[in-house]
């Protein structure tokens, strides 16, 4: 059936366009040489000053996307609320290359929330090094 191929479309993709322009949300999209230097083809992030109003929708999108796609998942749930999550999704093929896909979601102190989507040739280790070397 056709909808099986639609799995390629992740629900979190819609969140970036939907919330990217909101007042208390910072959207970052990298392109060009920065992406290349980290072996990424896509990097998108949303940082919510207060993620609470968006939390349920983000959580639903993540649950949907991980269902058929997740190869690896790490989640921290607190009273039914997803506090932090990391997913490595099944590879996707683009222009003859198999690309890794990652979703990272985290609620920090004062309800600040971050949602990141990464696609590229980079390995899980490279991705972790890139994300956490700045901390």
Give a label for each model feature.
Residues 12-16, 70, 135:
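Terminal interaction module
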Residues 42-50, 116-118:
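Second-shell loop/turn segments in exported
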Residues 36-42, 55, 105-106, 114, ...:
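Helix-rich interaction surfaces within compact, conserved domain-sized segments
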Residues 123-135:
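Short, low-complexity, Pro/Ser/Thr/Gly-rich segments in the mature regions of secreted, periplasmic
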Residues 17-43:
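N-terminal targeting signals for Sec/Tat export/insertion, comprising classic cleavable signal peptides
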Residues 46-94:
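Mature extracytoplasmic domains of secretory-pathway proteins
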């Amino acid at each position: 059936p056709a909808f099986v191929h639609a799995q390629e479309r992740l629900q979190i993709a819609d969140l970036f366009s939907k919330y990217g322009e909101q007042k208390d949300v910072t959207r970052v999209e990298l392109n060009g040489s920065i992406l290349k230097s980290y072996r990424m083809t896509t990097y998108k992030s949303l940082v919510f000053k207060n993620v609470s109003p968006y939390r349920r929708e983000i959580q639903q999108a993540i649950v949907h996307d991980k269902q058929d796609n997740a190869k690896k998942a790490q989640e921290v749930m607190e009273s039914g609320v997803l506090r932090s999550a990391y997913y490595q999704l099944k590879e996707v093929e683009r222009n003859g290359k198999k690309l890794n896909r990652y979703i990272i979601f985290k609620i920090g102190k004062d309800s600040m929330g971050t949602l990141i989507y990464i696609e590229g040739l980079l390995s899980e280790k490279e991705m972790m090094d890139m994300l956490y070397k700045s901390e």
